[in-house]
Amino acid sequence: MPVSTRSKVMKQERNEQENTNLNLPLRNPHQGLKEKMRALTLLYEQQKRASFSLRNPNHNQSPKPEDQRFKTQLLDSSKKGDRFHRLDGKDSTFVEEDTKENNVFEADRIFGVSSVPVKPSGVIRKLSMGNGARNVSEAEKLESLNASVSRILVFVRLRPMGKKERENGSRCCVKVLNKRDVYLTEFTNENDYLRLKRLRVRHFTFDSSFPETTTQQEVYSTTTGDLVEAVLEGRNGSVFCYGATGAGKTYTMLGTMENPGVMVLAIKDLFAKVRQRSLDGNHVVHLSYLEVYNETVRDLLSPGRPLILREDKQGIVAAGLTQYRAYSTDEVMALLQRGNQNRTTEPTRCNETSSRSHAILQVIVEYKTRDASMNIISRVGKLSLIDLAGSERALATDQRTLRSLEGANINRSLLALSSCINALVEGKKHIPYRNSKLTQLLKDSLGGSCNTVMIANISPSSQSFGETQNTLHWADRAKEIRVKECEVNEEVVQVGEEEGADQAKLLLELQKENSELRVQLAKQQQKLLTLQAENIAAANNNNNISLTPPSISSLMTPPSALTAQQKKKPRHSLLSGTCFTPESLKRTKAEEAVKELQLTVKALKMEMERMKREHGLQMKKQKDELMKDLCSRKSEKTPERCKETRRIVTRGSLRPKEKEKELKSPSHRFASPVAAAKKRSFWDITVANTSPALDRRKTRSHGLVHQEAPSKLLQPGFARPHMKH
């Protein structure tokens, strides 16, 4: 075949292939993205419905007619020859659009380029749910998760409108309904065209909302009453107030003398319950009070250097923080008053007594008891009461003063707190607790095993609308924080066999002594009763014999109680017998019996004190004997050759040796040595060896030789020489 005809044939075949490619419909490149978007929209709607059904189980939500395209669907991928996949239950409009697109573009080929057939996306299979079966399984999983994990309880308290706010013409923008719902209304200007279409009313729902007429006792009983009971059982609890400056946080936590706050009421309730439970065990209450001021931790009960935060297995600990043991409510009130005096409060633009620091009051309750096997059971509960400083906005005209620096540090710590709340809500692995000292101290309260209560304080004034909206927003976010289920902090200390035997022996001895003392007390009571009966019988016999009661009076009143005039002038009238009726006799006898019983009880107490002292002396003797035994064993282990090499140093060994043929005078023992052989004292040695004494410049005074005066110091081994006159 000639070359020309061959080229013509090849061109003709190439043109035919291009024509066939042109006739084929092309694939839409955006078809896969559309399928993914539909699947994600479907998943979002299903998750939204599931969460709504969990929050409101009694609410039956009926699907809207226009939302039929978001029904649960499954891909029909059984046919391999299909060019596109249809979703069951689609509207006709969506089917027509897909058919139009697929008529124009082929699903497997792109113009001019051969491609691999597109596999149906597996995302839709995973995300689509059929007939609500998986909704039920996910709901069960969420219920089981909620049973094992608790959340933070969030409460909102609205303060009343202030006098200055009324004078400035501010309006109330917050309304509390049904003690749960909070409605926030924004008052805008008609000339503010940018905010005309903005949503004016916002609705929030919390665990409980307190209007401005709520008392302090109602707030405490609703928010913190159950936490105190849990702390006594060995669990951890924390309460903190959040809000803008001037919203009433310090009033809610501390209160006044007439209306005490949550801290004071919690302490009173705690000690009242401790007194009720102290019969079956031993309760110990420790107290500490600290503040975070400008990112430094201070001790309010004993001010001094800043404290350092350290972390161990038990949690965040402030090194050097003093803990006071409290025995009564009055002691705690005195400590609180002293700590509040040391707290940093300064007047600001919004509040005359604004808190410039975050205050944290920690109350640790330890309960110890013994079980049947004499093991010590220890339960420790911690209650943290936190008063946060208020966030405030700095004006552009404010100078860089101390107040502005304090406000910047407060806002920085509250920003770190809000970032921790965001991370906890979103379920992130890393929670930025170390961004601030405040979040480090609140680590156990936010993400640990702790029952946490948040009280959001808001202002009703329309002038502080932004701060109120921000506080309600973060409080609504904090509702979603999940914390671990709080377990009982219980520790069982098992007593060793030897210690257990000694303690059991001591317990048996004390029980035996107690039983013996009880027997003696019963005998004394029996004797007392017999004496009383004999006295009453004798008195009755004397009354029957004669009407005069001198015998009865002599029995009832001791002779020392009679005055001199009564001894000189005894009464013999018949009317005197009416002074001693049987009722008065019984009364006096009962008084005597009570006095004798008091004497016996006093004697028994003295005997018990004596036995305790003897027991203490005996334990001390045993301890001394044990120490002597240990010392003797240690001395026996030392080698004997050390004893031989020991040298006893005395004053005689330190004296200079006597020269031969030296005459001894009678006053040799009492005279000091010769001046030439005089010993040099410490000060002479140090002065002579100093560099200035060696290198200093000689003058005329140095050339003169001065005779040294004899030292008046008492030399070792010699007596003071006699003074010559």
Swiss-Prot record:
InterPro entries: Kinesin-like_fam (IPR027640), Kinesin_motor_CS (IPR019821), Kinesin_motor_dom (IPR001752), Kinesin_motor_dom_sf (IPR036961), P-loop_NTPase (IPR027417). Residues 499-541, 583-617 form a coiled coil. GO terms for cellular component: microtubule. This is Kinesin-like protein KIN-8A. Residues 655-665 have a biased composition (Basic and acidic residues). Residues 1-32, 652-672, 691-725 are annotated as: Disordered. ATP binds at G243, A244, T245, G246, A247, G248, K249, T250. GO terms for biological process: microtubule-based movement. Residues 151-481 form the Kinesin motor domain. Keywords: ATP-binding, Coiled coil, Microtubule, Motor protein, Nucleotide-binding. The gene is KIN8A. SMART domains: KISc (SM00129). Belongs to the TRAFAC class myosin-kinesin ATPase superfamily. Kinesin family. KIN-8 subfamily. One of its GO terms (molecular function) is ATP binding. PANTHER family: CENTROMERE PROTEIN E, KINESIN-LIKE PROTEIN KIF19 ISOFORM X1.
